[in-house]
Amino acid sequence: MEIQFQQPNLQQHQKAGTKGGKFKGRNRNSNTNKFVGVRQRPSGRWVAEIKDTTQKIRMWLGTFETAEEAARAYDEAACLLRGSNTRTNFITHVSLDSPLASRIRNLLNNKKGNKKQEGVVDVGVDVDVPAPSASTTSTSSNTSNSDKNDHNSLSSGKVQNTMLFDDAYKPDLSNCKEDFQSCPPQSNFSWGFGPVFDRFPIAQILDMPKTDGMIDAASLELSEFERMKVERQISASLYAINGVHEYMETVQDSNETLWDLPPLCSLFC
């Protein structure tokens, strides 16, 4: 009875040992088939491919029957691209005359040519950018011409204004001066006309600035403004004197000898 119970246990241990041996064999085979830059297709053949991120290169090295052949192709391409210090699957000696070396050399030359063309395109763009400076110079010249035209129009307007001022009414004060000089010095006008003349500084008005024949437009415009100011003040003084004269006629007696004098308005006419 004891022997019958022990036999099933032995059979179970034997089955477990055979399963474990199978798993170990698979793991060993998978480890030996792993190479850098090599992968296996579903058909069973091996493919080698190399990538270089610094130079932006991805190169198909080909399809091989064994993983070792694909790994050696990868090692050769890696040494040509990155140098002898790169990571490889085997210790390899690169031959510069191999077809793979010529392929990699052509690929690198194409990459360099593309970079040079991109640099030439960039330089051309940089050279073409300053072209709008001509338009800016033309616009600046147009603005300067417009400013000159505006200045000329303003100066012509000032000249026209001065011509209009020349046609304005100018009172003649020659008779006023002659009548004032012909009046006797004994006459006293302190009875009511002193404050009137004090309000209108005619002496200051008559002192006009003496200018020569050659004057600029600014001084000419200023002299015209002063002349208009003088004319307005003189007309205001004449209105005030006439008003005082009429008031004195209504208040004072017309038989007084004072009113035998000529009208005061004739002094300033």
From Swiss-Prot:
DNA-binding region location: 34-91
Q: Where in the cell is it found?
A: Nucleus
Q: What happens when the gene is disrupted?
A: No visible phenotype under normal growth conditions, but roots of mutant plants are impaired in the interaction with rhizobia, formation of infection threads (ITs) and nodule development.
Question: Where does this protein have compositionally biased stretches of type Polar residues?
Answer: 1-15
User: Per the record, what is one GO cellular component?
Assistant: nucleus
GO molecular function, one example? DNA-binding transcription factor activity
Q: Which organism is it from?
A: Lotus japonicus (Lotus corniculatus var. japonicus)
Q: What is its main location?
A: nucleus
Q: Which UniProt keywords apply?
A: DNA-binding, Nodulation, Nucleus, Transcription, Transcription regulation
Q: Which InterPro entries match?
A: AP2/ERF_dom, AP2/ERF_dom_sf, AP2/ERF_ERF_subfamily, DNA-bd_dom_sf
Q: What protein am I looking at?
A: Ethylene-responsive transcription factor ERN1
Region of interest called Disordered, as start-end residue ranges on this chain: 1-36, 128-157
Its family?
Belongs to the AP2/ERF transcription factor family. ERF subfamily.
Q: Which PANTHER family does the record match to this protein?
A: ETHYLENE-RESPONSIVE TRANSCRIPTION FACTOR ERN2, SHN SHINE , DNA BINDING / TRANSCRIPTION FACTOR
Supply the Pfam families for this chain: AP2
GO-annotated biological processes: nodulation; regulation of DNA-templated transcription
Q: What induces it?
A: Induced in nodules 7 days after rhizobial inoculation.
Q: Where on the tree of life does the source sit, at the highest rank?
A: Eukaryota
Q: What does this protein do?
A: Transcription factor involved in the symbiotic nodule signaling pathway in response to rhizobial stimulation. Functions as a transcriptional regulator required for root infection by symbiotic rhizobia, infection thread (IT) formation, and nodule development. May coordinate these processes. Functions downstream of the CCAMK-CYCLOPS complex. Probably not involved in arbuscular mycorrhizal (AM) symbiosis.
Q: Which PROSITE patterns match?
A: AP2_ERF
Spans of biased composition, class Low complexity?
A: 128-146
